[in-house]
A protein has these predicted regions:
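Active-site loop/turn elements of alpha/beta-hydrolase fold enzymes
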Residues: 3, 30, 85, 132, ...
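A glycine-rich helix->loop->beta "capping" turn
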Residues: 15-28, 34-37, 45
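Catalytic loop of short-chain dehydrogenase/reductase
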Residues: 32-34, 39-53, 58-61, 72-121
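Rossmann-like NAD(H)/NADP(H) cofactor-binding core
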Residues: 79-81, 126-128, 170
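C-terminal helical subdomain
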Residues: 129-132, 141-181
């Protein structure tokens, strides 16, 4: 599935409908990375921002829209989790780089909140965005404090508590604490 293509996402949803009567959980973890991500404004190629936002912010909402009929059929309540980042927090912004990635994640946060407002009266559907923390996912980040296997269990428990939590915060850390927009 090409998350940047509405046609591709719609086709994937159509295939899923042939295979299952419902979906209980969607985790959107799409992002882009470019050689310019770590560059500051004078060296940054601004043409990279729009594609980053299309993949990392619009893409997850594209997925939710296409899969909405299957999500609404969940017998246990469906949850959509959008993987954001502290880089998308405007209130915590300290960097002079990440012009593409930070913009993408800030846009994802806004779109998540807008969709949350739309589904607020649906007791069977919820959406959150999460800053997952720094995880040891490859040999390049051995200093990361979070073990991926332990972290997966922590996130599973968090997702279960957030499935029906319409009153709690929408942008949270991997421990469920509110994170500044």
């Amino acid at each position: 599935m090409d998350i940047a293509s509405t046609e591709s996402v719609s086709a994937a949803a159509g295939e899923a409908e042939k295979l299952t009567p419902c979906i209980d959980l969607i985790i959107n973890n799409a992002t882009t990375a470019s050689a310019d991500t770590m560059k500051e404004l004078p060296e940054f190629n601004l043409d990279l921002i729009a594609p980053a936002v299309d993949v990392g912010a619009v893409g997850p909402i594209r997925v939710m829209k296409a899969f909405l009929p299957l999500l609404k059929k969940s017998p246990i309540g469906a949850l959509v989790v959008n993987i954001s980042s502290e880089a998308g927090s405007i209130g915590k912004c300290y960097r002079t780089f990440y012009l593409d990635y930070g913009t993408e994640k800030a846009a994802l946060n806004m779109l998540t909140m807008t969709v949350r407002n739309y589904i607020k009266d649906d007791p069977n559907l919820n959406i959150i965005c999460i800053h997952p923390g720094w995880i040891r996912t490859n040999p390049a980040n051995t200093e990361a404090p979070l073990d991926p296997y332990e972290h997966a269990e922590t996130l599973r428990r968090l997702f279960e508590t957030k499935r029906h939590d319409k009153d709690g915060p929408v942008f949270v850390t991997h421990t469920g604490e509110p994170y500044p927009w």
